């Protein structure tokens, strides 16, 4: 078995042994270790250990594996209509020779998977904007989160942007509307977030800088700047404070489900980074449902400085 794969952003920072199982099914850990030691599994043509983590756009090669490949559930292929392609093209903030920036709508995945169908990569793969190339996803943005999202047009651009995200040289600002009144107007959250890799419990450090832009007894509008990039970090941290984000059906309190909004009130508002001494700043307008809830909850938003 000789195969080559490109790691997508949904698997960024995943251990190579776990990633291997995702690709070829159930395989004994000892056999994976053997393949790694003998160089039958390599990342970017280099020998690695089982603890090595894959990064977005890494190239993983399998050489002469004598393990019979098991059936892995295939991703659902999405064929977008012309109307869907046009509606997403209308959300583009910037389109240059290296990448596209758009204001992603809530409810659409970045990439396809075994559970998700409608996704940006498949949509823009059919767009004339990516004619002669293909869209590369360079960072994560949850399906239900709206706002600034970037797709590269070339492998070189994808590798550069991915490294900027990994090295925390991309500065991200989110806006969230959460239940209740936050006690502290600004500061820093440092939390230990728990996730599971199979049966293994993993604790990850999470850091976010926050500032309350407006608040009352019913709700708070919060500016969030994540320093780390843990999965569901902002949602988990607000939930841990007992003040979950409106519309969050996963991280919610029992008494916050009443009159729950259809949309998650978490928006990727702005992204900043520097390439070749050129500053790039991209801002995504708030969706109508977000503005409507601001008005309903009597919260004011005058823009970020």
Regions found by a protein language model. Name each.
Residues 1-305:
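RNA pseudouridine synthases
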């Amino acid at each position: 078995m000789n195969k080559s794969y490109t790691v997508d952003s949904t698997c960024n920072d995943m251990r190579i042994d776990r990633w291997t199982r995702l690709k070829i099914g159930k395989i004994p850990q000892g056999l994976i270790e053997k393949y790694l030691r003998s160089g039958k599994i390599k990342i970017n043509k280099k020998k690695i250990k089982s603890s090595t983590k894959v990064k977005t756009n890494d190239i993983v090669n399998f050489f002469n594996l004598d393990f019979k490949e098991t059936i892995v559930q295939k991703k659902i292929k999405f064929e977008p209509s012309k109307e869907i392609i046009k509606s997403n093209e209308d959300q583009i903030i910037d389109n240059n020779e290296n990448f596209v920036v758009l204001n992603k709508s809530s409810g659409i995945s970045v990439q396809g998977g075994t559970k998700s169908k409608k996704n940006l990569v498949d949509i823009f793969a059919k767009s004339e904007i990516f004619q002669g190339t293909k869209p590369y996803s360079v960072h994560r943005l949850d399906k239900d989160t709206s706002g600034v999202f970037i797709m590269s047009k070339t492998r070189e651009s994808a590798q550069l942007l991915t490294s900027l995200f990994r090295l925390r040289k991309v500065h991200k600002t989110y806006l969230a509307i959460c239940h209740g009144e936050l006690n502290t107007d600004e500061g820093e959250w440092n939390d230990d977030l728990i996730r599971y890799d199979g049966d293994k419990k993993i604790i990850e450090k999470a850091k976010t800088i926050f500032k309350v832009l407006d608040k009352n007894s019913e709700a708070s509008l919060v500016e969030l700047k994540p320093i780390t990039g843990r999965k569901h970090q902002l949602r988990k941290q607000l939930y841990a404070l007992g003040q979950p984000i409106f519309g969050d059906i996963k991280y919610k309190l029992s008494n916050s489900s009443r009159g729950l909004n259809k949309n998650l009130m978490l928006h990727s508002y702005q992204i900043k980074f520097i390439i070749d001494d050129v500053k790039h700043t991209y801002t995504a307008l708030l969706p109508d449902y977000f503005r409507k809830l601001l008005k309903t909850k009597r919260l004011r938003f005058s823009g970020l400085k």
